[in-house]
């Protein structure tokens, strides 16, 4: 996989990625599901989902240089027809593509934007938006620093699980039908 020549990115290790997808399997994900990968960088999580049987992945990344690398990675992996790349700020659009509802959404913003989680914060506003863009029972996976604690609920999203690996944490939220 191609990656940017910068120290700004926070690539997820293969061990953590394997552990995360083991957790997702118990929710019958990602096989056959519609997925979004927000703040995707070079596409590691979305490409992993495709390699594990996801039907389609929408990648959202705002940095033009990173998008160019992402597109190379998608092409190299052979998933061009099963994916779409949107160059935009995910805080502004979420995962929006028409009226698509997503079964699984990865949210991996810069840690500096996730330190504030209370109502009205950028992360909170994004999660409320994603609650409208996810399918009923859809899963949203949010990567943050280990010390960041998300609220137990954002709109109709409820925190159902939290895992920690090293200095990072992953919080899994699920959309209820309410």
Go through each PLM region and give its residues.
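Class I S-adenosyl-L-methionine-dependent methyltransferase catalytic core
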Residues: 1-178
């Amino acid at each position: 996989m191609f990656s940017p020549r910068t120290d700004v990115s926070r690539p997820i290790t293969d061990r953590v990625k394997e552990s995360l997808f083991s957790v997702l399997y118990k929710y019958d994900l990602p096989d056959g599901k519609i997925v979004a990968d927000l703040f995707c960088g070079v596409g590691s999580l979305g490409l992993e989902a495709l390699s594990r049987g996801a039907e389609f992945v929408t990648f959202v990344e705002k940095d033009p240089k990173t998008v160019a690398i992402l597109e190379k990675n998608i092409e190299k992996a052979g998933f061009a027809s099963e994916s779409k790349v949107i160059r935009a700020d995910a805080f502004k659009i979420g995962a929006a593509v028409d009226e698509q509802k997503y079964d699984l959404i990865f949210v991996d913003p810069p840690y500096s934007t996730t330190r504030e989680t209370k109502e009205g914060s950028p992360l909170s506003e994004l999660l409320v938006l994603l609650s409208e863009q996810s399918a009923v029972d859809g899963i949203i996976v949010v990567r943050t620093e280990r010390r960041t604690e998300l609220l137990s609920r954002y709109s109709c999203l409820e925190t159902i699980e939290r895992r920690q690996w090293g200095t990072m944490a992953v919080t899994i939220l699920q959309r209820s039908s309410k």
